[in-house]
A protein has these predicted regions:
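Small-molecule kinase domains that catalyze NTP-dependent phosphoryl transfer to phosphate-bearing small molecules
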Residues: 100-145, 152-153
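Hydrophobic anchor at the start of a short beta-strand
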Residues: 9, 54, 80-81, 129
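Glycine-rich phosphate-binding loop used to anchor ATP phosphates in small-molecule kinases
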Residues: 31-80
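Conserved phosphate-donor/acceptor-positioning beta-strand/loop module used by diverse small-molecule
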Residues: 76-97, 132
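Short, hydrophobic alpha-helical segments
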Residues: 48, 150-153
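Conserved substrate/cofactor phosphate-moiety recognition/catalytic segment
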Residues: 1-52
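Hydrophobic alpha-helical packing elements
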Residues: 36, 65, 93, 138-142
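Conserved nucleotide-binding/hydrolysis micro-motifs of P-loop NTPases
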Residues: 16-18, 61, 86-92, 136-138
C-alpha cells in the first residue's frame, strides 16, 4: 500500500477481492483464487488503459499467476516490474506472521505451516524480478527503497 501511495498508483489486492468473493457465499477453493486473480487483472487493465500505474499485491507463486500480469501488460502496452518481498530470518518471519491482521473476514491469516507449504511449491522466476529481503527493514523503509528503485527503471 505504501508504494502505491508514494507513487500515486492504484493499489489492487488479490486477498481483498478473494475476501469479497467469499463474502458472497461462494465456497472456498482454487476457483475463487483464480477468480480473484482474473478480477484484479481486469481492474488493472482498465486502470492501465486510463493511464494509471498499478501496484498489485499478490503472492504470484506460480507461472500461471505471473502470466496473468504479463497478459495485462501485453494487452495494455504497459511495462511490468515483478517485486518479490521475502524475509530471510525465519524467526522474524514467524514473529511478523503471528502479529499480522489484514482485517479480512473470509481469507484467514496463514499459519507458519501454510507459509512453509507454499514456499515448497513456489515456482522459480523466469522473469527479471526485484527481490528485497525485508528481515531487518521496517515497512516504510522497504517502501522507500522500492519506490526509489522503481523510479529509476
Amino acid at each position: 500500500v505504501i508504494v502505491a501511495v508514494n507513487t500515486g498508483s492504484v493499489h489492487l489486492s488479490i486477498d481483498a477481492v478473494e475476501d469479497s468473493i467469499l463474502a458472497c457465499g461462494l465456497p472456498p477453493g482454487w476457483q475463487v483464487g483464480v477468480a480473484a486473480y482474473e478480477t484484479v487483472r481486469a481492474m488493472a487493465e482498465q486502470n492501465l488503459r486510463l493511464g494509471h500505474d498499478v501496484v498489485v499485491d499478490a503472492v504470484n507463486d506460480s507461472e500461471e499467476a505471473r502470466q496473468t500480469w504479463r497478459t495485462a501488460a501485453a494487452r495494455t502496452g504497459a511495462s511490468i516490474e515483478f517485486v518479490h518481498l521475502m524475509i530471510s530470518d525465519a524467526l522474524e518471519h514467524q514473529r511478523r506472521l503471528s502479529g499480522r491482521d489484514r482485517c479480512l473476514t473470509y481469507v484467514g491469516e496463514p499459519t507458519w505451516a501454510d507459509v512453509q507449504r507454499r514456499r515448497a511449491d513456489y515456482a522459480a522466476w523466469s522473469d527479471e524480478v526485484l527481490e528485497f529481503d525485508t528481515a531487518t527493514w521496517a515497512a516504510d523503509e522497504v517502501a522507500d527503497a522500492l519506490t526509489a528503485r522503481l523510479s529509476t527503471r
